[in-house]
Amino acid sequence: NKLSKSDLEKQLLYIRLSISTLLSNLWNEREESVDIKINYFNGGNSFLKNSISIGDFLVENAIWNDSKSECTWIAQLIDGKRIKLGMSNYTLYEYGGTIAFLITLSIETGEEKYFNTALGAIKTIERYYDNKLYEKKLSAYDGIGSLIYLYYKIYTVKKDYNYYLKYKKLIQELRVIEIQDNCIVDYVGGLSGLVVLLCNIYEYEKDDSLLKTIIKLSKKLLEKCDECNL
């Protein structure tokens, strides 16, 4: 049987992904710049049309389980100086950001296919997260804060109280988690970005439990600032 154009494009994508794992010393190589404009989109300067093109690509290339309840994407993940392939993760810095994008796109377009794909990806992540395959890093973009954001976003969009309870459970985990003295405090990978995220949610929730969590994390931030004479 002949491959359809869509199937052929998927096969080419998988080949490119596979070849990317052969590269080494990623940070030491730099391509010479070329004065060529690459047209990635056909939607002109319309941000929404271009976003729809990205969303359709993500929906088309999502890999679903047999029951169509969970999905993921083959992800390029940085592993030291090399690239490795794996399932998509929950961090906003990587595929959690993809999920957040799809949720927002569903709001802007009213198309449920984007939200359903985002939810399928969340369910895959939850299953592995429950099996302790993910670290609970104290970070908004590269840790537990990413899941907090995604759960809260789903709750605000769909008013699904189950996701509010999941969000609250993670807040409770933060309340009791032991913060290591050598914890990362920068905005992307550490405590400061997480505190900002929680403060933004507090603006809407006015929740005492959340406030206590913010105070706990902020005290640690102040301790680290004192250590650095900031």
Q: PLM features: what roles do these ranges have?
A:
Residues 108-113, 132-142, 156-166, 179-188, ...:
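Alpha-helix boundary/capping segments in eukaryotic regulatory proteins
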